């Protein structure tokens, strides 16, 4: 994730895109608009479906020169040749994921609102740390809130990419960039809207020194 310009990190949602066709269609719209990081997130137990979809997304990401990260499944990331895996606090061991995926793999860690969790994750080999939720979230409505000041502290403390997640829209994303986030992770705001391309471009066009984009959330 580059530090000179923020990254939009798109996260899929199996409820919003229940079929492989709908998933690939909306993801391709986002990638075509300039999104370069994608996380495949499907918590279902349907392993054949998840394998099929992950392989399809890997092909799309290769076409658009984007990174594919698998949520919570190191084995699936290895199987499809994904660029890495994202692990929650109860999703698996960072050290084991690094051993399986290799030194070049991207490993992300959910750290909620805790600098201590982030410090521990980085010590274990995480590539980036994710904080949030910062706003009301449709994907995880019961997640504990995080304060904007957390991002400034993280930016001062860590040199890795700082990912903000939770309720991010084109109308509030600039606040997070100004506070210290390098990466905006978005799910519902991007993929629940019919005009995925427009939403992606609005998110990509945010700047930390500008007023929030004047678009509806």
Curated annotation (Swiss-Prot):
Annotated residues for binding of 2-[(2R,5Z)-2-carboxy-4-methylthiazol-5(2H)-ylidene]ethyl phosphate: 137-139, 167
GO CC annotations on file: cytoplasm
Reaction catalysis annotation: 2-[(2R,5Z)-2-carboxy-4-methylthiazol-5(2H)-ylidene]ethyl phosphate + 4-amino-2-methyl-5-(diphosphooxymethyl)pyrimidine + 2 H(+) = thiamine phosphate + CO2 + diphosphate; 2-(2-carboxy-4-methylthiazol-5-yl)ethyl phosphate + 4-amino-2-methyl-5-(diphosphooxymethyl)pyrimidine + 2 H(+) = thiamine phosphate + CO2 + diphosphate; 4-methyl-5-(2-phosphooxyethyl)-thiazole + 4-amino-2-methyl-5-(diphosphooxymethyl)pyrimidine + H(+) = thiamine phosphate + diphosphate
Record: residues binding Mg(2+): 72, 91
Biological processes per GO annotation: thiamine biosynthetic process; thiamine diphosphate biosynthetic process
Annotated InterPro entries: Aldolase_TIM (IPR013785), ThiamineP_synth_sf (IPR036206), ThiamineP_synth_TenI (IPR022998), TMP_synthase (IPR034291)
Pathway listed: Cofactor biosynthesis; thiamine diphosphate biosynthesis; thiamine phosphate from 4-amino-2-methyl-5-diphosphomethylpyrimidine and 4-methyl-5-(2-phosphoethyl)-thiazole: step 1/1
Cofactor(s) the record lists: Mg(2+)
Class of this enzyme: transferase
Listed GO MF terms: magnesium ion binding; thiamine-phosphate diphosphorylase activity
Chain residues that bind 4-amino-2-methyl-5-(diphosphooxymethyl)pyrimidine: 39-43, 71, 110, 140
Record note on cofactor: Binds 1 Mg(2+) ion per subunit.
This enzyme's EC code(s): 2.5.1.3
Keywords: Magnesium, Metal-binding, Thiamine biosynthesis, Transferase
Family assignment from sequence similarity: Belongs to the thiamine-phosphate synthase family.
Function as written in the Swiss-Prot or TrEMBL entry: Condenses 4-methyl-5-(beta-hydroxyethyl)thiazole monophosphate (THZ-P) and 2-methyl-4-amino-5-hydroxymethyl pyrimidine pyrophosphate (HMP-PP) to form thiamine monophosphate (TMP).
Protein name in the entry: Thiamine-phosphate synthase
Provenance organism: Saccharophagus degradans (strain 2-40 / ATCC 43961 / DSM 17024)
Upper lineage: Bacteria, Pseudomonadati, Pseudomonadota, Gammaproteobacteria, Cellvibrionales
